[in-house]
UniProtKB/Swiss-Prot annotation:
Organism field: Emericella nidulans (strain FGSC A4 / ATCC 38163 / CBS 112.46 / NRRL 194 / M139) (Aspergillus nidulans)
The family this protein is said to belong to: Belongs to the PhyH family.
Name of this chain's protein: Iron/alpha-ketoglutarate-dependent dioxygenase asqJ
Metal-binding is among the record's keywords: yes
Enzyme Commission number, as recorded: 1.14.11.81
Cofactor(s) it depends on: Fe cation
Amino acid sequence: MGYPKAFTSSDSEPEPDLSRDLGNPVMGNPGVVSRSSSTVAQHSVRNNPTGPDGRLAGLWNARALLRFPAEVNGVRLDFKSVSSRRPTSRLSLLPYSLCSICPSSQATMTSKDHVKSQIPRLSAINDLHKIWPTVEEHGAAIIESFLSLDIVRRLNEEVDPFVKIEPIPAAKTKDHPNHVLSTTTRLVNVLAPISKAYREDVLNSKVLHRICSDAFHVYGDYWVLMGAVMELAPSNPAQPLHRDMRFSHPIVEYLKPDAPATSINFLVALSPFTAENGATHVILGSHKWQNLSNVSMDATVRALMNPGDALLITDSTIHCGGAETTGTETRRLLTITMGISQLTPLESNLAVPRPVIESLTPLAQRLLGWASQRSAAPRDIGLLTIRGNSIEKTMNLKAEQPLHDDEAEPLCRETI
């Protein structure tokens, strides 16, 4: 299977309708910001194939906005002047209130004519030892053949029925609705009871565990913070540039800039990732940035991938999903957010039927929170213990037991 067509300067994507809230997955409940027409005029599609403002620069959030000059009710924003008003963490881009905006501020944006470095591509088979050092250096790497095509096929088949009927993330029927994902996105997590490929192949992937061991050894055990299939419908809007974990774990904002990553994200292509259907934008090296005043879409490169390839990024790598511009293609991915077990997962596997859990390997059980955890502390006393004993010992938890299809049904039925 050949690689998707490269993204060139002749490719173009339509300008967004900034008159409505597109429900992006980062900005929460943003207001609408209008771009200066003069700014638009200065940046043609030819010189800026991704759009002068990153397509969704109009979405506003006073804390997480990763954009450059725009207007809010006629007031022009300038990131250099705004971000210098007060000390901020490495992730806080603007002051908490709009009172610090300087109406007279002006900033310019120039197209970069030099050839950009592309995302490093490594083989899951031949370059395993290079993957994490590469991500540490560049903030991202594409792992070719992270999952085999057979696993991709089976995983897609197993999750299909659930993706088709999943309500939108912000559905009123949910008591913890997600208002930061677009209404054209479907997300299905807690995959263990509904996908044999996930619970047997993905959770026991030697490639995944080698990378996680390399990344998290200074902290101790790690587990799945979320494993989810995301499907993005035709014409799905682009996301704003962002860093992960900022709408669930604000503690990461208070870590030292040089602290080792506490979580990483495998974005596994379950369908082709092309420039036209919204392949992820990444800013290489941005995981080391503290000054975010000049973040722009001009600095991004695209993660073009075949099914089974994975884009690996850290929780500080600036990235975003691109816009689907064909109007006909659906893009699907498996996002596996792995993190140290000192962080609370975004998903809960407590409702997974015990027969399903007992069919797993001990390693997979630990990843889903059905085993006690250990830190790298010299005198570690353990995490998730019961009066000094492990979960698995106290509950007499078995492992690698045969599983009949009907034993996974309770949660599956409830999910449907």
